[in-house]
Amino acid sequence: MQSTSSTSSGSCSRPLEGSTLNSGGSAENVARDGGSGDDSVGIGDENPSGSSAATNGHDSKHNGFIVNNNGSSSRIVDGENNRENTSCSGVQLDKSNQEIIRLIGQYLHDVGLDKSVQTLMLESGCYLEHPSATKFREHVLMGDWSKADSDLKDLEPLIDNGKLATITEMKFILLEQKYLEHLDDGNPLDALHVLRSELTPLQHNITRVHQLSSYMMCSTNQDLYQRAKWEGKGILSRALVMERLQTFMPPSVMMSPRRLRTLLQQAVELQSQHCPCHDMAWETNLETVSLLTDHCCTTDGFPMQTIQILTDHCDEVWFCKFSPDGLKLATGSKDSTVIIWDVDPYKLTLKHRRVLDGQAQLSVSFVSWSPDSKLILVGGTEDSHELYIWNVDDGKLVVKFSQSLEDSLACGAFSRDGARFVCGGQKGQLYLCDLNGTIVDSWEGVRVNSIAFRADNKTILAADNHYRIRGYNFDSPRSDFDILREPHPIMTFSINSADRLALLNVSNQGLHLWDIEDKCLVRRFQGIRQSNFAIHSCFGGVNESFVASGSEDKVVYIWHIKREEPLAKLAGHTKTVNCVSWNPVYPSLLASASDDATVRIWGPKPNGSSATTESDDCSSSSSSSSWNMT
């Protein structure tokens, strides 16, 4: 950015006149100033007093430079070495303080406070960048390519120790802009000269040279802008070129654009990573946070204590699942019943709707909801050969599926489009069926513990007795393939809504998180106790930022998806917690099913109460939670 400004010359009392602006800023800032600014501040300009070249030279040994102050103490501008600088006010500035002042100066200029920058630089005795870098910036923004090339020669010893490849790439960037501007001006012969006599001899990025040559055929300037993806001749495109060139320069010579904002953004992101309750749907940037306090998401609205206990089952409750619309909960029990509960999202309470008890002598081990929340698929243990599909609105049995008395149908799931379901078990059957219960296809010899459809509605994932999760595609051509393998039996698993992560409950190992696209183990969550019984975990919270699982130690565990240590331990059940389900629409609700024949509904604590107090709805039973906020 070209601008007239002032800097110090042996005195703190007045600025120099006729010097050049060094912004160290961004393309946006250059565009804002329009490439000029008579009232701007001069920072890092050449010594205007006519002193020798050595005065404005650089000490290559230290990769910095010393500016003559006409008799005053020298100001050492050295961002790479631990050397002190004496400011005009007599304050000794070490390397760290010099860098902070330079960062502040760059930021102040970016927001347009140029007079403040002038005062800061005069009083501190610091410069934002090397004087040769200032000239280089000025000439690039002016489009004076011959002078910019000369400036680059002066800067060579400071850039990557004068490495030829780096200097060549920088020259290429300059000549590329020069070539495009000639085309924009309607000077194809000048552009051709640059292409043949300046760009081609560099022998750099030949593919790009060929691409540039094709722009000679552009019939209009707009065609050139579109094909080259270029802003056109002017201050904005030159500022973007300057940003590219800055990346090659050490920070002691020229800081990268928006450096302070970059550091602050990194700090905010690091704080969000350390936030135990961080909501990953919340965009972490400088516009959404306060820099005056450390970031920490609150636990308001988080399911942290029992708000209701459902006691309608008369035996162990093995499964619970909220519907996709968040307005219903299905619970399945060893007592052969499935109970449908209505969710009041405003009062955060559940009300008994109906009992589905047509599956006589079937201990209900799993329930799967259709995507429209109207149907449920119900199955039993590995000894069961039947599955049931119920309409939850009218309570009618839609399908009773059974292929053979020898079958084991202990797991099943609807497809993501709700048009089909898949089921299987430990005796080697894997059936793909339509909603009438007609077998569309089957796969023999597949012994599975848990099953799920992927989002493509074609691929079925199944955990088998070889400690694997494999993919099965029934479409032509049929295919099966390994997704992942564990060293111990996979008891159950679930897939997140983004269809990228799998949450596995592994025998004697606990809870593991896998990336099923990259096929790698992401995290081992600590805390739960699990032997050889089926425990069902889930993703949940806003944007599925958390995971939860039951445990044989009677506790519900909650983790942030990026932390191995449990975030919360929800106590209240008196026996093993078999299953947990997080409401997908109302993330303040979490359900847990237990061998103690109850289903607990966990919700936010009332305002003013502690995490260990009980709500009025469950005063007859103990309920508490412990929170790990470290």
Swiss-Prot record:
It comes from the Eukaryota. GO terms for cellular component: cytoplasm; GID complex; mitochondrion. SUPFAM superfamilies: WD40 repeat-like (SSF50978). Residues 1-90, 604-630 are annotated as: Disordered. WD repeats lie at residues 312-351, 359-400, 404-443, 445-482, 485-524, 529-569, 572-612. Residues 1-13, 609-630 have a biased composition (Low complexity). This is WD repeat-containing protein 26 homolog. The lineage of its organism: Eukaryota, Metazoa, Ecdysozoa, Arthropoda, Hexapoda.
